[in-house]
């Protein structure tokens, strides 16, 4: 995405970014109608991928068409993020709503300076979910106006595609499975971690049965061997270190105890935060 950006180019976005925006919208200060923040990502030979984001505190003044961003907060948070993810750069900004707001041109000027040589993009997402759909659109500003006269900006749609990795698919399938379960008392809760482990183990067992059936058929000359499948099986077997059953059982039980300890600690912290929040509300009243 250079200054001569092609409107036919595609920009990819990670599902985690969408969940981060929804989380920021749910945690927005009382009285605020929308949230906005910085989009971060990578640029690889003209292919852009939005991988991260963070909200930026702001205050709108619609009567005078002005918006005040907490620039110091945005700069400090960006610097902190760069220490952890040094390959991420500013790609633009996001805001919640149904369409591009009037303050978009003002924010474009700020993020154009932050993006440097690339042109910033603007992600608009309807986080209210009133239509039961997550409406997400990506825009890019184009200069319009008469030569020698006053210039303006027009925000045009840019193709956007969700990029799913293996870890993303696991999480999305878990969310989909939970959302399709009817009759549960708490639909908003995730599946217990141990249930997910059992489901993953059952899926691996089914795949192993399929592989063993194929190998036995090839050895019994019931099926013609496939070199592509053989190389894939060889790569899968050599990628896993050779362990005896006792060492594997010990390693699995150790990881399982660590996971149970993490679940217990997170539950205790969550309960403590809920109690602290209720006590603070009682003091305010």
From Swiss-Prot:
Residue stretches making up the MPN domain: 11-145
Any one annotated GO CC term: eukaryotic 48S preinitiation complex
Covalent S-S links between cysteines: none
PROSITE patterns in UniProt: MPN (PS50249)
One GO term (biological process): formation of cytoplasmic translation initiation complex
Highest taxon above the source species: Eukaryota
GO function terms (MF aspect): metallopeptidase activity; translation initiation factor activity; translation initiation factor binding
Protein keywords: Cytoplasm, Initiation factor, Protein biosynthesis
Coiled coil: none
Subunit structure and binding partners: Component of the eukaryotic translation initiation factor 3 (eIF-3) complex. The eIF-3 complex interacts with pix.
Function recorded in the entry: Component of the eukaryotic translation initiation factor 3 (eIF-3) complex, which is involved in protein synthesis of a specialized repertoire of mRNAs and, together with other initiation factors, stimulates binding of mRNA and methionyl-tRNAi to the 40S ribosome. The eIF-3 complex specifically targets and initiates translation of a subset of mRNAs involved in cell proliferation.
Xref: HAMAP family: eIF3f
Family statement: Belongs to the eIF-3 subunit F family.
Protein name as it appears in the record: Eukaryotic translation initiation factor 3 subunit F-2
Gene name linked to the record: eIF3f2
